[in-house]
Structures are given as C-alpha cells and as structure tokens.
Amino acid sequence: MAAPPAPQPPSLLGYHRVLSPLAGIRVSPLCLGTMHFGGQWTRAMGDVTKETAFALLDRFYEAGGNFIDTANFYQGEGSEKWLGEWVASRGNRDELVLATKYTMSYRLTGPEKIKSNFQGSHSKSLRLSVEASLAKLRTDYIDLLYVHMWDFSTSVEEVMQSLHHLVAAGKVLNIGISDAPAWVVAKCNEYARFHGLTRFCVYQGRWACSYRDFEREILPMCQSEGLALAPWGALGRGQYKSAEEFQQEGTRNMGPQEEKHRLMGAKLTEVGERKGVAAAAIALAYLLHKSPYVFPVIGCRTVEQLEANITSLGVELSDEEIYEIEDTIPFDVGFPMAFLFESPQQKYRSDMTTRHIWQVTCNARIESVPKPRPIEPKQGYKQMDRK
C-alpha cells in the first residue's frame, strides 16, 4: 500500500530541493545568512540583538527553511556561537543543513600571541577551525564546509586531501568553495575526480542583477562541473533604494550609494509594482530564474524582510522581463564570450548556446539543445502528487 503524500509545507520555503548534482542532501530554496548575528560588528552592519536573531531563525524554521549559512570569521566567532545556542535550545539539529566556512583569520581577538596558523586554507588551519566550529555550533558534524576564499598559498593537493579526510571521518558531509577563481575550482575538482576524493558541490560568491561579473567564468564553470550556486549580495548589499531612501536609511556604513545600484533599484521597484511584490523579491527571483541549483543566501535583519524574501519563490519572470532588468545597466562580458556571441544585432545572454554563435551559423542553420532550466516558481500552494 502506497504511503500518503507528505503534508503541505507551511510556505513556499518548505518545498525542498536537491542541493546539486554532486550532493543529494535536501535543502530549502533560500539559505538564511547569519553574518548579521553575533553582536560584535554592530558599527559596520547595524545592531541585531540575540532576541531578534532567534526570532528570525524561528520564523525561517517555521516557514520550512532548513538551510543556514555562517562562518568561523563572522562577528568575531559570535555568529557560530549564537547559531549553536539557538540550535541547542530548539533541539532541531538533524532537521537542519548547517553550512560554515574556514580560511579567514577567525582568532583576531583571541589571546594567542602567534596567530599565523589561525587563517589560511592549509591543513592546520582547517583542523583548528573545524574543531572550534563544531564546539561553537554544538554539533558533531557539519553538513557543508566551505573554503571561504582561495589563499593562493596552499596547494590544490593539500586542500582537497585534507577536506576529504574530514568527510571520511564523518565530521563534514559536503564541501564547497567561496570567493575563488573559476580555474581554481575546476582544477580542484579535476584533481579530486581523478584521485577518488570528495569534490566541491557548491560555489558561494557575489552575484546580483547589478553584479553580473559572476556570469563571465564562474556561472558556466559551475554549470559544467555540476556545482550549485549560493550567491551572496543578491540584494545589492542594501543599495537597491532611491537616493532619498538611501540618505534616510543608509546601508551598514559601507560607503556611498553607487549609481548603478540606484538605477537597478528603480527598475526592480518598477517590475515589482507590476507584479505586486517588493523589489527584493524581484532581485531574488532574477537569480532563481538564471540557472538550476541556485540557492541565494539572504541576510535579513527583520522578520518582515524575511517574509518579503520568501515571496520571491512565487514570482515568475519572463525572458523579456529578465532582459529588461539586465539592460538597466551595461554589462561587458569580455573576451572571449563577447567575441563569440555578440554582434551589432545581438547582446550576450547567459543562456546562449551554439546556435547563437554567428561564426557557426553564418553558412548553415544550426539548432542546439537549450541549457537546463531551473525549477519553475510555484504560484501559491500546489499538491505534490505521488505517482
């Protein structure tokens, strides 16, 4: 006798997805970032009290979210400590997918006199950081561990061997990489592939409709290697506002508003008004439409912001609307993609294939298989029938 279907999720956040072709773990379509949590960086990032942080974590969890991101470095280690305290108090560790990172100088305020090995991607830094993260998160395993950045001093061999040993020991389940060149990631995964080691399954980096340099090399590399994408900065780091709003509210003491962000904010607001949602929902929906296996990292400071972000999962954008957003500010994809795909009649788009290369099609009509499409947004709630 077949089992009945699972109950309807409390929100669109509860329709979970496979993380990537290389990692079968199931995660919510949005990842809650906790860089605001910890109480140490209030001058740069604004004040989020522990009470507010726990309320955000509670609402994310109640809405069906299970994918949460932190790092050893955030808030002078305060982010991991608060997250670990919340998880322990709620008793829901195994329901969650916790992601953290190593490489950054996480002991900046520690009592140690010599701190040279409390940073970097090498084996000692990895060991020290992971043991500390496990203690702060109050757990005995990490679902996803990122190399936080490429330090350009540790070899591919050392990084991949050391990470694999942690996976084999059961302390880490999956590995990812952040803020690294595409060629480095490809080289790491090639080494792992040919030596029977664990491969990177997700890439985290800056990507937004006003930060499209990610699309030059990183996006196609991830699509080719089977990596998921966890973009940070999807909301323009708080700059998608009018000049008046920015002047009144500011943005975490991170400098003046850039003109490209003001223009993009106006366009996102315009598209959002047509669809009855906030500009932030359009910014997230844009990324969710660009490629499969995209899990934006959302950094919220209020429950209201979180609720607005969740609505992005029900927003449908046409190709024309995506192009409208992209054409708001210039984007130079650079050589060789511009040379191959652009012409006076054609702008580069990230979904282009062989049939869009004019040197290929100038003497023959060529058809090609489209690039894989992402999961379509859900319009309200849908029954998930089992066959």
From Swiss-Prot:
SUPFAM superfamilies: NAD(P)-linked oxidoreductase (SSF51430). Transmembrane segments: none annotated. Induction: The genes forming the sterigmatocystin biosynthesis cluster are co-regulated and induced on oatmeal porridge or the fungal isolates were grown either on oatmeal porridge or in YEC medium (0.2% yeast extract, 5.0% corn steep liquor). Expression is positively regulated by the cluster-specific transcription factor aflR that binds the palindromic sequence 5'-TCG(N5)CGA-3'found in the promoter. Its EC number is 1.1.1.-. The keyword Glycoprotein does not apply. InterPro entries: AKR_Detox_Biosynth, NADP_OxRdtase_dom, NADP_OxRdtase_dom_sf. One of its GO terms (biological process) is sterigmatocystin biosynthetic process. Keywords: NADP, Oxidoreductase. One of its GO terms (molecular function) is oxidoreductase activity. It comes from the Eukaryota. NADP(+) binds at residues 69, 178-179, 204, 233-243, 301-309. Substrate binds at H148. Pathway: Mycotoxin biosynthesis; sterigmatocystin biosynthesis. The active site is at Y74 (proton donor). Pfam families: Aldo_ket_red (PF00248). Belongs to the aldo/keto reductase family. Aldo/keto reductase 2 subfamily. Norsolorinic acid reductase; part of the gene cluster that mediates the biosynthesis of sterigmatocystin (ST), a polyketide-derived furanocoumarin which is part of the most toxic and carcinogenic compounds among the known mycotoxins. The first step in the biosynthesis of sterigmatocystin is the production of hexanoate by the fatty acid synthase (FAS) units stcJ and stcK. The polyketide backbone is assembled by the non-reducing polyketide synthase stcA by condensation of the starter hexanoyl-CoA and 7 malonyl-CoA extender units followed by cyclization and release of norsolorinic acid. PANTHER family: NADH-SPECIFIC METHYLGLYOXAL REDUCTASE-RELATED (PTHR43364), NADP-DEPENDENT OXIDOREDUCTASE DOMAIN-CONTAINING PROTEIN-RELATED (PTHR43364:SF7). This is Norsolorinic acid reductase stcV. It comes from Emericella nidulans (strain FGSC A4 / ATCC 38163 / CBS 112.46 / NRRL 194 / M139) (Aspergillus nidulans). The gene is stcV.
